[in-house]
Amino acid sequence: MYKPKISCLLLGLLSGLVFAPTFLLPALLTLSYLCCLVQKSKDWQEAAKLGYIFGFGHFLSGIYWISIGVSVYISDFWWAIPFALFGLPIILAFFVSASCVFSFFVRNNKYYHFIFCLYWVLFEWVRSWIFTGLPWNLIGYAFSFSDILIQSLNIIGIYGLSFIVIYISTSFYPFFTKQFDQLKVLLLTSSITLAVIITYGSVRLHNHPTNFTDIKVRLVQPSIPQTEKWSEEEFWHNLMLHINLSENSQPIDLVIWSEAALVVPYDIPVVKSELLGLLNSVDATLITGGISDNKKRGEDFELYTAMYALEKNGNKLFEYHKSHLVPFGEYMPFKKILPFKKLTHGFVDYTEGNGGLVYLDKYNLKIKPLICYESIFPDFVRTNNETADVIINVTNDAWYGKSSGPYQHFHISRSRAVENGLPMVRVANNGISAIIDPLGRVIKKLDLNEINYIDGLIPKKLDSPTIFSKFGNITILLIVFFIFLVNYLLDKKLINSRD
């Protein structure tokens, strides 16, 4: 048992490298070994332990960067670094362990491999909503490096793509058990499935060239270090950096700043004066991330993470409040039990908003606004977006430096564009900022920690809603049925050939 434990930990660590920015796809084969070990376990407790150890390694290498965010204010939160580095993998590993336990109980089933894949995706889905949810680094994102491979998201969503990836990745497991007839069936089924999604993706990209609206946007990326983001001494420097990057003689319709670009209320007279000076200079509307409150005091006071639009005459065209808040970052869960303050600036917890669409009548533009990690929740993005024209995602990933985190966040976010057939304008404080078309193609972008701006036209959305945007995760049944049918027919053909 000792050697399997060590190998599970090492292979789990390796498997976490299948995501951005490394996309080490050969590491997906580690899942075949896990699938084999679960089937050969002597009891469910052993399967649980092996799955847990693999899962711990998987999440440790995949989301290690969260501890970097905690270390930004190391003098206040030094004690939280080990909890961020090890605590989250310790918790998330239970989901891998649970999928292995359930799979163990069907280890003798003819379709054990197929059921193993189902349980893996089922517990990815559970992970996406339980305890507020964290659907980060779902295994389907291993394919997000390729425009072609992610096109099926418009039908089956990320959980459907996860099923494809886990199925292909574990199809080598009969090699370890010397079940070579089954190995032939699984490899052939995987090859057919991969060929189908490659063909579908290629044809879809060819048949849908990018079309553009006439709305021109300017994405501003100041790359302000997180240690200076909320500094009173740096406030005016940071504001003027935003303004200087936004000013240009080229005509523009919308200037877009990142999450918390304004760290004070916009209507402070001296701040508002600078903003209106900019907007009149460029003759444009500003969309920015900022903070907002309900103008009440005492126990009724509420603070929001916001996105709002300002006209050059000072009118606020819309205000959106973030509804998926980051636990421990923007609010403290179990506050009565845990006597700690949140990791972000200030002592007051942020309050949840209501979500939904916002409108810019002047441009006849309906926007699905997303702040920060709201973009990682497929169902949240899909909800109430039937009439949306564009997704605008503002975020601040400066917490995580040059780690894997900002790259993973970018690829996760652009997957929402493909799922919903909507273009995305993504503006990040330190990158990666980009204009993305409804098929996930990156039209223009600013790299991590680049200080610059880009101008571009907003791409048009697709002519009709995607299957996923209409029906949601129920569409995963399509790919499950397809793969099962191919598997069954090939298996039956193999049996008949023996007879």
Curated annotation (Swiss-Prot):
Main location: membrane
Biochemical pathway: Protein modification; lipoprotein biosynthesis (N-acyl transfer)
Residue ranges of domain CN hydrolase in the record: 220-464
EC number: 2.3.1.269
Protein name: Apolipoprotein N-acyltransferase
Annotated keywords: Acyltransferase, Cell inner membrane, Cell membrane, Membrane, Transferase, Transmembrane, Transmembrane helix
UniProt xrefs under CDD domains: ALP_N-acyl_transferase (cd07571)
Species the sequence originates in: Rickettsia bellii (strain RML369-C)
Membrane-topology annotation of the record: Multi-pass membrane protein
NCBIfam families: lnt (TIGR00546)
